[in-house]
Each structure stands twice: as C-alpha cells, then as structure tokens.
Amino acid sequence: MVHLTSEEKNCITTIWSKVQVDQTGGEALGRMLVVYPWTTRFFGSFGDLSSPGAVMSNSKVQAHGAKVLTSFGEAVKHLDNLKGTYAKLSELHCDKLHVDPENFKMLGNIIVICLAEHFGKDFTPECQVAWQKLVAGVAHALAHKYH
C-alpha cells in the first residue's frame, strides 16, 4: 500500500488533470521500447520497431501507450486501492502475457521522466516524490499476482 499525504495526493491529481494522455502515453511507452530494447519482444505485432525514430513514430506504440496511460489514470482515481484497481491487469500480465514485473517499474520511472519534461518547474521535487510513490505503488500492484 502506498501512503500519500494530502499534499502528495493534491500534487498527483493537479498534474494528472493537465496530462495529455495520448501524447504522454505514446511518448512514455516509446521511450521504454527505445531505452530498454528487449521490451520490444512483447510488441511483435506492432510492425517496425527497428530504430528510435521508427518506435517513436509507430502508430501502434502511440495507441497502446495512450491505453496504458489511460489505465494509469485509474490509479489516480483510486489512490487508496491500487491492488484492487489492478487485480485483473496483474493477472493478465502474469498468466497470459508473461511480462517481467520489472518492466512495470521501468515504465513507471519513464512516466515520471515524461511528466517532468512536460511540466518543467511545476513538477517540483516534492511533486516528484509523490509521483515516484505512485508509480512504485502501481508497479507493486501490477506485480501482485506474481507473488
């Protein structure tokens, strides 16, 4: 369980209300595939992922990134029940997709990087603390079925 102060929750919801899910989601997933190229093995049906440019401009990467970040929005809505929120996705990623749970941590950290880039000075160190707690909590909730 993630313990967030009321200030941290406020920071998370304030930033989230300004996030452009399509843009940021596509960027985050694309960055993960570029920075950690072994993760492309889960996306064989996405077509050309042979270079950073191909990954970042791939419409399937953009669409799936938006889907992932939309799902992440559920965490923002249910900050006090992340395990329950992600129970079905945890089962899917564990039992059917066989995704290494470390990937959840990597993607979470990349989401934080993207938010920092997009929001600049509004993404204060205190705000980053809140978001790091949240992405760690989401990663833990998604990995729950693996334990």
Curated annotation (Swiss-Prot):
Originating organism: Didelphis virginiana (North American opossum)
UniProt modified residues of type Phosphoserine: S45
GO cellular component, one term: hemoglobin complex
The entry's keywords: Acetylation, Heme, Iron, Metal-binding, Oxygen transport, Phosphoprotein, S-nitrosylation, Transport
Positions where Phosphothreonine occurs in the chain: T13
S-nitrosocysteine: modified positions: C94
GO biological process entries: hydrogen peroxide catabolic process
Summary of the tissues where the protein is detected: Red blood cells.
Record's protein name: Hemoglobin subunit beta-M
Function field: Involved in oxygen transport from the lung to the various peripheral tissues.
All copies of domain Globin, residue ranges: 3-147
Subunit structure, interactors included: Heterotetramer of two alpha chains and two beta chains.
N-acetylvaline PTM positions: V2
